[in-house]
Amino acid sequence: MTVIALFGAGGKMGYRLAKNLKGSRFDVRHVEVSDAGKARLKNDLDLSCVPVDEALNGAEVVILAVPDTAIGKVAAGIVDKLKPGTMVVALDAAAPFAGHLPKRDELTYFVTHPCHPPIFNDETDMQAKKDHFGGLFAKQHIVSALMQGPESAYALGEEIAKVIWAPVMRSHRVTVEQMAMLEPGLSETVCASLLVVMRQAMDECVARGVPEDAARDFLLGHMNVLGAVIFKEVDGVFSDACNKAIEFGIPALMRDDWKNVFEPKEIAASIQRIT
C-alpha cells in the first residue's frame, strides 16, 4: 500500500482531498497545523492528524495541499527528510513554475489541477448539477504534469490525481509551462476577467433601467447558446446581426495586443504576483 503524507489536510483543499482519499488503496497520514482543521477532520471524517516526522516516515508521496504562498516554505522545511525517489505533489502550477520547490534531483515533482465540471455536461443528478467546483458528485477533467523524475512515476501521480479529483473523465498530460498558461493565463487572466466584465455589463443594464432578473436571465441564457455555438457543442451559426455586433464589439472592448498575456514573461509576472 502506497503511503501518502497529506500536508494541509484540514484546509479548504486538503479536506476535499482527505475525503476522497479515505477508503482508497492509499495509506494516508494527515498533517494539519490549525486546531480548527484538526477538529474538522476528526468530527466530519473521523481522521486523526499526526506530527510531521511521523507522517514522513516511510512516505512515498507527499501532497502539498497548502496555499501557493506557503508551498516554498513548507517544502523547504521537509525536503531534507524525504528519501530519494519520493514524489512531491503540488496542486497548482504557480509555485512550481516560479521555482519555489527545492532543488533536489532525486525527488519526483508531480503537478495536477482540476479543470472543474464543464458547463456542457450530461449530469442528471441534482447534487452533481450543483457541484460546480467538482470533486464531490460532478464529473470533471484534469490536467497533470511530471515536472521532474522518472517517466515511470507518471502513472502513480495520475492514479493519485484521479482519486483526489474524482469523479474524473479525461486526464490530460501537459507540461508545467502549459499548465501555467492555462492557469492563471487562460482561466483567470482571460476567462475570469471577461466574466467580471460580463457581470459589470449586466449591472450597467440594470442601472439603466432593465429589471435585474430580466437582465440576468437574458445574459445567462445567451451565454449558454452562444457558448454552445462558439465551442462547437452544436452545429450552428450566428445570425448576420450577431456577427456584425462581434465585428464591432471586439475592437471596442479588447486591446489589440491582449494576447500578450500569454507571453512567457507575462505569465511569469502574473504568477509572481500570487506567490
Curated annotation (Swiss-Prot):
It is an enzyme of class 1 (oxidoreductase). NAD(+) binds at residues 11-13, 32, 68. GO terms for molecular function: metal ion binding; NADP binding; oxidoreductase activity. Pathway: Carbohydrate metabolism. Keywords: Carbohydrate metabolism, Metal-binding, NAD, Nucleotide-binding, Oxidoreductase, Zinc. The keyword Oxidoreductase applies. It catalyses: D-apionate + NAD(+) = 3-oxoisoapionate + NADH + H(+). Its EC number is 1.1.1.421. Its cofactor is Zn(2+). The keyword Metal-binding applies. Zn(2+) binds at residues 113, 183. InterPro entries: 6PGDH_NADP-bd (IPR006115), NAD(P)-bd_dom_sf (IPR036291), PGDH_C (IPR031663), Semialdehyde_DH-like_C (IPR037161). Belongs to the ApnO family. Involved in catabolism of D-apiose. Catalyzes the conversion of D-apionate to 3-oxo-isoapionate. This is D-apionate oxidoisomerase. It comes from Rhizobium rhizogenes (strain K84 / ATCC BAA-868) (Agrobacterium radiobacter). The gene is apnO.
